[in-house]
């Protein structure tokens, strides 16, 4: 009889290690919640908590005081519910597909109603059940993505019976440019939201996303729902990629801590001669004798092919450029600058960490941190830790 594959063996067999700091996540939530109080602060944990594991991340936010959790799909909410205590509330941002209303009500999950059709479907269920059903009502104030249009809102207000069947907990909208403080679209959306609320007196409201929590008190209303800021990304800095030096020297204005590190294992080190080609298509040609190392992660693990010949890893303070094309399961590094024998089979190199932030990797990929974060695959060994005062306590 064979022995079971232990957790230690699984971790050693993985191509890389993704370490998630639950203490930093709690800090980021508390920092935002404290700054915008008495506005309630929710946590957006859609897409498996931005790829970091909602079943571990959401309870960390709960421990920090969060009681409101937003996901995108009903299935996400149902899967997460067992990991939260009964006084937590789950909201479904995308609303409900036909035929799922009864399940949503049965589970005690609140839908965000984004169209008159969704409102009508939810009200019809309330009529069948003989009771008002709670929900959030979203308005489109300028993003043209989700929410009732102005015409739908007018029709809704005319239908007193329809409104009477729903217990509207919040009227919400979403900022399209909240991460750009100087963008005039923010003020326009705020004005539209304020005008809508004037027609729904005393109804609690929510507008601010991560960026919105840094725009000032007029954007806070009664509930804010930060997402990316909770996961260690300053929303005002994430697009500042035009000048790498300026980006690296720009000091964060907000007490947001990084929450993850990513390292990858070396699977081979070799010496190559001048003229040797590296990777698919031979896009890199050695300009002299050099030492290269192959690591066991690739674009299947969220390290996009656009990193080919321009990204990097780190070993200590030494930058190790990516050479050749990124493959599905492997990446090749120029490690000539390291003393011979420094790297060997199983050695770990840093991909995201103190020497290279998530934003830096996103910049090298010509994308945004959200895309990298949510693309980090399930092949990594995931380690959840609490880092306190320089000490580390491993939880999984």
UniProtKB/Swiss-Prot annotation:
Catalysed conversion reaction: L-alanine = D-alanine
Stated family: Belongs to the alanine racemase family.
Domain of life: Bacteria
Gene Ontology CC, one term: cytosol
CDD domains, sorted: PLPDE_III_AR (cd00430)
Modification N6-(pyridoxal phosphate)lysine occurs at: 46
UniProt GO molecular function: alanine racemase activity; pyridoxal phosphate binding
Function as written in the Swiss-Prot or TrEMBL entry: Catalyzes the interconversion of L-alanine and D-alanine. May also act on other amino acids.
Keyword ATP-binding attributed: no
Pathway(s) the chain acts in: Amino-acid biosynthesis; D-alanine biosynthesis; D-alanine from L-alanine: step 1/1
Active site: residue positions: 46, 280
InterPro entries linked: Ala_racemase (IPR000821), Ala_racemase/Decarboxylase_C (IPR009006), Ala_racemase_C (IPR011079), Ala_racemase_N (IPR001608), Ala_racemase_pyridoxalP-BS (IPR020622), PLP-binding_barrel (IPR029066)
Binding site for substrate: 145, 328
Stated name of the protein: Alanine racemase
Organism: Brucella suis (strain ATCC 23445 / NCTC 10510)
Keywords linked to the UniProt accession: Isomerase, Pyridoxal phosphate
Cofactor: pyridoxal 5'-phosphate
Enzyme class: isomerase
EC number(s) per entry: 5.1.1.1
Record bears the keyword S-adenosyl-L-methionine: no
GO biological process terms on file: D-alanine biosynthetic process
């Amino acid at each position: 009889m064979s022995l079971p594959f232990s957790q230690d063996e699984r971790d050693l067999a993985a191509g890389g290690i993704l370490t998630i700091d639950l203490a930093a996540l709690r800090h980021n939530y508390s920092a935002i919640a404290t700054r915008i109080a008495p506005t309630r602060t929710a946590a957006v944990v859609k897409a498996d908590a931005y790829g970091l594991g909602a079943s571990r991340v959401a309870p960390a936010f709960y421990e920090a005081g969060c009681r409101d959790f937003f996901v995108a799909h009903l299935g996400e909410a149902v899967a997460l519910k067992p990991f939260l205590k009964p006084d937590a509330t789950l909201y479904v941002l995308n609303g409900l597909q036909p035929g799922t209303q009864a399940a949503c009500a049965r589970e005690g999950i609140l839908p965000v109603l984004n169209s008159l059709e969704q409102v009508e479907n939810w009200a019809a269920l309330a009529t069948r059940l003989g009771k008002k059903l709670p929900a959030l009502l979203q308005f489109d104030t300028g993003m043209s993505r989700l929410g009732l249009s102005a015409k739908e809102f007018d029709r809704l207000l005319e239908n007193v019976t329809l409104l009477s069947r729903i217990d509207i907990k919040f009227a919400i909208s979403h900022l399209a440019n909240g991460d750009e403080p100087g963008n005039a679209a923010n003020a326009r959306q705020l004005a539209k939201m304020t005008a809508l609320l004037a027609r729904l007196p005393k109804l609690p409201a929510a507008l601010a996303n991560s960026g919105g929590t840094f725009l000032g008190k007029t954007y806070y209303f009664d509930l804010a729902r930060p997402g990316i800021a909770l996961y260690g990304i300053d929303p005002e800095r994430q697009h500042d990629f035009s000048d790498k030096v300026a980006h690296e020297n720009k000091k964060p204005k907000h007490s947001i801590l990084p929450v993850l590190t990513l390292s990858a294992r070396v699977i081979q080190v070799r010496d190559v001669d001048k003229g040797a080609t590296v990777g698919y298509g031979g896009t890199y040609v050695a300009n002299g004798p050099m030492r290269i190392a192959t690591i066991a992660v690739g674009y299947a693990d969220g390290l996009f092919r656009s990193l080919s010949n321009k990204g990097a890893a780190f070993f200590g303070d030494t930058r190790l450029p990516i050479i050749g094309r990124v493959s599905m399961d492997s990446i090749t590094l120029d490690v000539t600058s390291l003393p011979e024998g420094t790297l060997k089979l199983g050695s770990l190199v840093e991909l995201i960490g103190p020497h290279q932030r998530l934003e830096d990797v996103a910049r090298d990929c010509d994308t945004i941190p959200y895309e990298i974060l949510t693309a980090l695959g399930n092949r990594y060994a995931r380690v959840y830790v609490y880092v306190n005062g320089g000490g580390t306590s491993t939880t999984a």
